[in-house]
């Protein structure tokens, strides 16, 4: 092991081919450098003015802090390497983006990340953005992305305890971004990423997208098309602050997604959880709260979903639907209430700003629910809104606290001519 404490000593160690380098203290002003294959770098703090550490193959970064400008990449990879081997990040803190890409010559690799924290980053200026469902998506402070069109190119990963941003300094862009190659419709059609476990800590993001922009979004935790994640565990609170900032978003394929801490959106046209991809089981064991106009709680826009359970969902903005189901799904359960307090307002829908009303639960003509169980109540408080709107179908229904509308000109239930739902025995309350 070689110990270094100055930029020159670090450069000398790299030039000499040292395979195990310990940084003692803080090294400021070093130019960005490439870590040779098989090299381990650990300890201390590195301060850069531009790009930081470029990984090649079988590298380890451990117990280290890497700082650069928010707009730069603190950790990136050499895309001229065919096989990344195993890139290990353990107990790593950065200011600036962590970005691992499969492009150019990269065709394989595994990423093992444990206790990784991006203090803040600004990725709004990145040229490459995945596109789907009428929008581009901003990269994340932590980004793992297979951009190769060839489906034979495969990355794998285990990502444990990844955090991004703070309440005082959110990441500008998405937070944690995992994706493969997708087509313009948002469906995977090339290189893939397979993650066995994605476990996230605290995440704070602000895409800083101008209000009413129709074709750009970000996500706090974002599984992009071309990514398969066996298990997602959102163990820390995830909060987004700006327009079009989704909190939890799936375009890919996820086995089980569990959230055990608050899911919160403070910007217009944000969504607590939105699904466009394949998702077997969703279990949100903490409140979903949105406060912006057009900011929905949960939306099954597209794809598949077998089972979803929520603790509670509350929206306060105009046009902020609590739950909207636009595709067939299995069981939908909410332990507590689904409550909205807004009226009519604009909301982003697949790349178009549309006028919506703050319905508590909407099952559209293309949507269906095999079994619906609400442990609390469905409630709306806005003017001229509907609490429960059904144009599709629902199987067995249980709403323990009933369906309630309290706003002027509002009604508790609206059922379309071709809809199918049995509300017998359920308490329905509309304003007199």
Which ranges hold each PLM region?
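Acidic Gly/Asp/Thr-rich repetitive segments characteristic of extracellular carbohydrate-active
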Residues: 1-24
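Leucine-rich repeat
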Residues: 6-10, 99-100, 246, 321
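Extracellular beta-strand-rich solenoid/capping regions of secreted or surface-exposed proteins
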Residues: 15-16, 28-42, 46-85, 96-106, ...
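Beta-strand-rich solenoid/repeat architectures in extracellular/passenger domains
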Residues: 42-48, 62-74, 89-100, 114-139, ...
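Long, low-complexity intrinsically disordered regions in eukaryotic proteins
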Residues: 145-146, 179-181
């Amino acid at each position: 092991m070689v110990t270094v404490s100055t930029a020159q000593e670090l450069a000398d160690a790299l030039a000499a081919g040292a395979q195990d380098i310990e940084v003692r203290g803080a090294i400021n002003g070093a130019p960005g450098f490439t870590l040779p294959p098989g090299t381990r770098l650990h300890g201390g703090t590195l301060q850069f003015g531009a790009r930081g550490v470029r990984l090649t193959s079988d590298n380890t970064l451990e117990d280290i802090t890497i700082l650069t400008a928010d707009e730069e990449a603190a950790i990136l990879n050499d895309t001229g390497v065919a096989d990344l081997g195993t890139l290990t990040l353990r107990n790593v803190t950065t200011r600036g983006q962590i970005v691992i890409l499969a492009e150019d010559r990269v065709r394989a690799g595994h990423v093992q990340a444990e206790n990784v924290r991006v203090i803040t980053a600004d990725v709004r200026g990145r040229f490459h953005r995945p596109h789907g469902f009428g929008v581009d998506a901003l990269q994340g402070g932590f980004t793992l992305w297979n951009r190769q069109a060839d489906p034979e190119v495969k990355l794998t990963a285990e990502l444990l305890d990844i955090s991004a941003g703070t309440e005082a300094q959110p990441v500008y862009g998405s937070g944690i971004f995992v994706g493969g190659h997708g087509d313009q419709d948002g469906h995977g059609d090339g290189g893939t990423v397979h993650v066995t476990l994605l476990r996230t800590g605290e995440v704070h993001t602000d895409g800083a997208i101008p209000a009413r922009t129709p074709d750009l979004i970000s996500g706090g935790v974002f599984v992009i098309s071309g990514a398969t994640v066996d298990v997602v565990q959102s163990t820390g609170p995830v909060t987004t602050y700006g327009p079009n900032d989704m909190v939890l978003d799936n375009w890919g394929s996820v086995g089980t997604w569990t959230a055990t801490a608050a899911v919160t959106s403070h910007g217009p046209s944000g969504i607590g959880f939105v699904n466009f991809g394949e998702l077997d089981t969703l279990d949100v064991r903490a409140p979903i709260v949105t406060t912006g106009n057009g900011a929905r709680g949960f939306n099954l826009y597209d794809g598949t979903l077998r089972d979803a359970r929520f603790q509670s969902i509350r929206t306060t903005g105009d046009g902020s639907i609590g739950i909207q189901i636009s595709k067939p799904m299995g069981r939908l359960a909410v332990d507590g209430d689904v409550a909205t307090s807004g009226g009519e307002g604009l909301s982003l829908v697949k790349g178009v700003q549309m006028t919506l009303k703050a319905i508590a639960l909407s099952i559209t003509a293309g949507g269906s629910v095999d079994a619906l169980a609400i442990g609390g109540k469905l409630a709306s408080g806005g003017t001229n809104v509907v609490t429960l709107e059904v144009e599709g179908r629902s199987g067995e229904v249980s709403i323990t606290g009933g369906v309630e509308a309290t706003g002027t000109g509002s009604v508790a239930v609206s059922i379309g001519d071709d809809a199918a739902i049995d509300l017998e025995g359920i308490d329905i309350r509309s304003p007199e």
